[in-house]
């Protein structure tokens, strides 16, 4: 594996050294993947919730149009999403040139991965939360209105707690999608050791250079993380069924 300057190293790991490579393994791709996924989830959490809330209240025709638009990144190949992001945010594009004046550059930077991961993870958050909101008992909101409660209070103190299991499930799925993102990320930020390397791009680069042992280690780490995420999703689903909620 290429030496990654400035990477975060750990002397010990919960996994065996045969998998992790011990203290000599560079952990930057893991750290970078986790921070990109976490920051992406913060974005899709707020955008997904408010998009789902307002779309659910729209007329059927407009709702259908926006639903297709918001869900499109989920069915498009990730490389196509990355291509559109390059067209939009590339350093030679109008928006990219404008952002560069403020020192903001998405192409070939780690935070460009946030943009790519947010785009591909958003549909999962949006659709899951929209389903939770559509299953919400509207009589609860009407009761709150008759008591003089504001729409803001009803949203945050009634609707959100009732739909929390669906929201959490959507957030976990979005995190998993962002963590495993490869196509759009590789198109926008590429693979620069110590700067833009993620788990997915690192696995590909290691495989391409015939370093199968290191690639296998990263694959096993990714599988372990994904298994934990799936366990969390299943746990949330069981809690949701027991509560008889959304």
What are these regions (language model features)?
Residues 1-24, 60-63, 233-246:
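Transmembrane alpha-helical segments of polytopic membrane transport and secretion proteins
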Residues 11-42, 57-59, 206-213:
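Periplasmic/extracellular loop-to-transmembrane helix junction in inner-membrane transport proteins
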Residues 19, 24-28, 187-227:
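Interhelical loop and adjacent transmembrane-helix boundary motif
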Residues 21, 82-118, 189-192:
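Membrane-interfacial helix termini and adjacent extracytoplasmic/periplasmic loops
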Residues 39-70, 83-85, 132-134, 140-141, ...:
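Transmembrane-helix boundary motif in ABC transporter permease subunits
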Residues 42, 126-129, 133, 137, ...:
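Transmembrane alpha-helices
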Residues 62, 123, 130-141, 145-146, ...:
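C-terminal transmembrane helix and the adjacent membrane-cytosol boundary/short C-terminal tail
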Residues 90-91, 167-205:
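Non-cytoplasmic
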């Amino acid at each position: 594996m290429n030496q990654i300057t400035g990477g975060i190293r750990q002397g010990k790991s919960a996994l065996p050294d045969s998998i992790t490579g011990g203290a000599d393994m560079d952990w930057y791709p893991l750290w970078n993947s986790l921070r990109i996924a976490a920051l992406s989830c913060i974005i899709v959490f707020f955008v997904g919730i408010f998009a789902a809330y307002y779309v659910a209240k729209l007329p059927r025709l407009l709702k259908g149009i926006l639903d297709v638009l918001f869900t499109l990144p989920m069915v498009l190949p990730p490389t196509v999403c990355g291509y559109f992001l390059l067209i939009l945010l590339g350093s030679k594009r109008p928006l990219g040139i404008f952002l560069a004046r403020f020192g903001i550059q998405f192409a070939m930077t780690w935070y460009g991965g946030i943009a790519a991961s947010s785009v591909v993870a958003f549909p999962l958050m949006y659709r899951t939360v929209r389903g939770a909101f559509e299953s919400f008992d509207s009589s609860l909101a009407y009761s709150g209105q008759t008591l003089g409660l504001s729409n803001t209070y009803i949203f945050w103190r009634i609707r959100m707690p009732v739909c929390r299991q669906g929201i959490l499930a959507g957030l976990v799925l979005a995190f998993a999608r962002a963590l495993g993102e490869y196509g759009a990320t590789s198109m926008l930020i590429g693979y620069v050791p110590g700067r833009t390397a993620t788990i997915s791009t690192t696995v590909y680069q290691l495989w391409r250079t015939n370093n199968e042992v290191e690639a296998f280690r990263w694959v096993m780490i990714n599988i372990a993380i994904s298994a934990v995420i799936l366990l969390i999703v299943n746990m949330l689903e069981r809690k949701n069924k027991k509560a008889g909620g959304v």
